[in-house]
């Protein structure tokens, strides 16, 4: 993909040999995200209700410019991931949304959140400003997989669709016992 940065009078943006704007304080950059999530949870054997007892995230953050802010980003990402894993669902029928409003879209609240233990691993990036890496998006990715695997270990059954609700767990246990 190419972008044109010119006008009839010449280039609008002067570029260095790598194609980056010259003297730009923060040119676009990428760095790989390395992180792991561990979750300790329990599943009620009768209702299938999931309770998260402990949630731990270890994430390579490059250089931690503001560790408290980074922990907040990780906690927010984990909250999004827990919602994806356990409660958030948009129901469709033939392309039509059946959720009447957002009260039917169950996002986790602070009362639903476990304490998230953050382990910040600092391995500065050569690409990021001051060696920092992006920290906001990566924590959203792992929670559904970590929670699904922990539920499978706790119950002996694997639910294949998100969100993993108490009803889906109970049905999977019934099917497994047949």
Predicted regions and their residues:
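C-terminal catalytic domains of large/alpha subunits in multi-subunit enzymes
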Residues: 1-178
């Amino acid at each position: 993909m190419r972008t044109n940065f010119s006008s009839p009078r010449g280039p609008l943006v002067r570029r260095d040999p790598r194609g980056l704007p010259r003297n730009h304080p923060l040119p676009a950059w990428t760095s790989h995200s390395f992180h792991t999530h561990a979750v300790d949870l329990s599943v009620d054997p009768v209702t299938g209700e999931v309770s998260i007892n402990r949630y731990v995230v270890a994430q390579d953050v490059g250089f931690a410019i503001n560790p408290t802010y980074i922990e907040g980003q990780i906690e927010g990402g984990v909250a999004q991931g827990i919602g994806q894993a356990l409660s958030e669902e948009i129901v469709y029928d033939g392309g039509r949304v059946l959720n009447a409003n957002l009260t039917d879209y169950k996002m986790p609240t602070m009362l639903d959140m476990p304490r998230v233990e953050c382990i910040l691993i600092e391995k500065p990036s050569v690409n990021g400003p001051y060696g920092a890496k992006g920290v906001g998006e990566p924590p959203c990715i792992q929670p559904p997989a970590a929670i699904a695997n922990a539920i499978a270990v706790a119950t002996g059954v694997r639910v294949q669709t998100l969100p993993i609700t108490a009803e889906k767990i109970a049905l999977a246990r019934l099917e497994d016992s047949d």
